[in-house]
Structure formats: C-alpha cells, structure tokens
Amino acid sequence: MAKNSRRKRHRILAWIAAGAMASVVALVIVAVVIMLRGAESPPSAVPPGVLPPGPTPAHPHKPRPAFQDASCPDVQMISVPGTWESSPQQNPLNPVQFPKALLLKVTGPIAQQFAPARVQTYTVAYTAQFHNPLTTDNQMSYNDSRAEGTRAMVAAMTDMNNRCPLTSYVLIGFSQGAVIAGDVASDIGNGRGPVDEDLVLGVTLIADGRRQQGVGNQVPPSPRGEGAEITLHEVPVLSGLGLTMTGPRPGGFGALDGRTNEICAQGDLICAAPAQAFSPANLPTTLNTLAGGAGQPVHAMYATPEFWNSDGEPATEWTLNWAHQLIENAPHPKHR
C-alpha cells in the first residue's frame, strides 16, 4: 500500500515538473516572438508624446475603392518650411505670409505648372520657431515647435487620405521642416504613418538635422558628417532646455529609403556636423549655431548655387525638377 502511494506521489510530481517545464518553454517562445516583432517594428521616429499611440505598431495597407471624389487631387505636395518661415495663421493653400520662405521656390512653380486637379500644394502651418534659452526672445521652444509641426503635417495627410484614399504624396522639408518631414516619412516607411508607403511618390529633405550617412539617397555633392541631432544626441542638458536632440531615426526611412533624398551643403553644421562640431562646454555658441546663427551663412543659401549645386542647379531648382517629374508620372486615379 505504501509502495503504491509512493508511486502515485512520484507520478504527480512528474506531472508537475512537466507542467512547469512546459510553462518555461511557452514563456521563452512568447519572449522570442516579442523580440522578433520588436525587430520588425522599430520605435517611432517622432519623439514620444507628440502623436497619440496607434492601435498597432504597424498597420497593413488599408483597402481602397476603385474611384474617389471628383474634388480630390491626384497628388498632394506637402511642404514643411524651416524655422521662422511658417506660422499657425498661415493659409496652407496660399502661403503668402512669408514670401522669402525657401520652399516657395518649389511649391510656387509646381502650382503654376499643374492644374489643381492634378496637384494640390499644401504648406504646413505651424509655429516654426526656435527659443534660445539663454535669451528672452519669447520664441516657442524647439521641442514644442517641432511637435506642433509634426501634428499639423500628420493631420493634413490623415484628412486627405480619409477623403481621397487614392491620392499620392510628394513630401519636402527644409531645416526644422526637414526634420519633421523626415520623421513622418520614417514612420510611413516603417508602417506606422498616416498613409500607406506605396502612396508616397518621393521625399526630399534639405538640411535635415537628423541626416545620417547610408540612410536615404545622399544627393551629390554630399559632405561627410551627420545631422546636429545625431552629433548632439548624447548631450542631456539640451533636453532640459527644450532642445531634445533625438539621434538617428529608428528603422531609417524603411520602405521609403530608396525614395528619400537628402540634400546638404558642405559647411552646414545643421546637417553635416563633424563629431566635434559643437561644444557643450560653450553652450551659447552651440545654441546660436543650432538656431541658424553664428557661422551659418551656408544654411540660408540653398536657393543659390554658391554652397550646393548639382550641375549648376541649386537645391531648390533640383527639388523642383525632381518633383515635377514625379507629379508628371504619378498615377491618374479614377473619379466619380
């Protein structure tokens, strides 16, 4: 009797051990799946808290109708201006408030070259400012300005995509606007953006503060160095000043890598900063350079061939010709 009881106890213990081992195996499998999913879906390029969290890390392509409304343009060209070249009061469809804004040299001619039914040029209206925390300039902080611009760009694309699901997109940005457009392009290319990646015809970023060697198409002449946000990523004091330097974009541009162009001039410390370009010990100079100030005439000259040109074309003309070709060859969705 005692022998039977011992056998029974051993059997129960064996079952318990087997169950525990199965639980461990299941936990390992779950951990591996989570790790693999994490590798497939890198975190958003947009700083935390700027956009509401999506329902899933990456979404599949949305179903599309065969037709869209007759009021929908075939293409929407979204332009994100640089610091001090936009405001929330600006009319996105008629941006006359800042007549010297760099990207008007692209969107203006495009609007003249194509009918409104073919392309809508949309300039993101946001508080494009950069507060120097060592001064009393009453400007919005870079973090808040960038967040506002990102939300405005995502809202514009989301609205257009909801109303016109067959419309394609061309994205351009300059300086702070290049960071914003690049972040949104990164999210789109990695399956987290406001539209599906196959709807984006192309992206061009001029003087991108998150420019990184080997990521996107570096349009020659392309200098060495990387964006200031990468060079200064490890300087935590800047975050406390409203100047978070976000480092490389996780996942790069994903599926949009081959469709994303980076234009940067030699000597522009915003997009081509050598490793020792900024001195955290000399904070005033660093902040002034980030604001496009000291030693930065290069940053303001992309409409001229003086510091950057491709076969004599300045950055704005190169971007205009590139965009014109994309729009000319873009799909012609059916309308009802």
Curated annotation (Swiss-Prot):
The chain crosses the membrane at residues 16-36. It is a single-pass membrane protein. Residues 44-65 are annotated as: Disordered. Its main location: membrane. Disulfide bonds join C72-C164, C264-C271. Optimum pH is above 7.0 for lipase activity. The keyword Disulfide bond applies. Residues 44-58 have a biased composition (Pro residues). Changing N132C: 2-fold decrease in kcat for 4-methylumbelliferyl heptanoate and loss of phopholipase A activity. Changing S175A: Loss of activity for both short- and long-chain substrates. SMART domains: Cutinase (SM01110). Its EC number is 3.1.1.-. GO terms for biological process: lipid catabolic process. Keywords: Cell membrane, Cell wall, Disulfide bond, Hydrolase, Membrane, Secreted, Serine esterase, Transmembrane, Transmembrane helix. Signal peptide: none annotated. One of its GO terms (molecular function) is phospholipase A1 activity. It is found in: Cell membrane; Secreted, Cell wall. The essential nature of the cell wall protein Culp6 makes it a promising target for drug development. Belongs to the cutinase family. Shows esterase and phospholipase A activities. May be involved in cell wall biosynthesis and/or maintenance. Can hydrolyze various substrates, including the p-nitrophenol-linked aliphatic esters pNP-laurate (C12), pNP-myristate (C14), pNP-palmitate (C16), pNP-stearate (C18), pNP-butyrate (C4), phosphatidylcholine, phosphatidylethanolamine, phosphatidylserine, 4-methylumbelliferyl heptanoate and palmitic acid and arachidonic acid containing phospholipids. Does not exhibit cutinase activity. This is Carboxylesterase/lipase Culp6. It comes from Mycobacterium tuberculosis (strain ATCC 25618 / H37Rv).
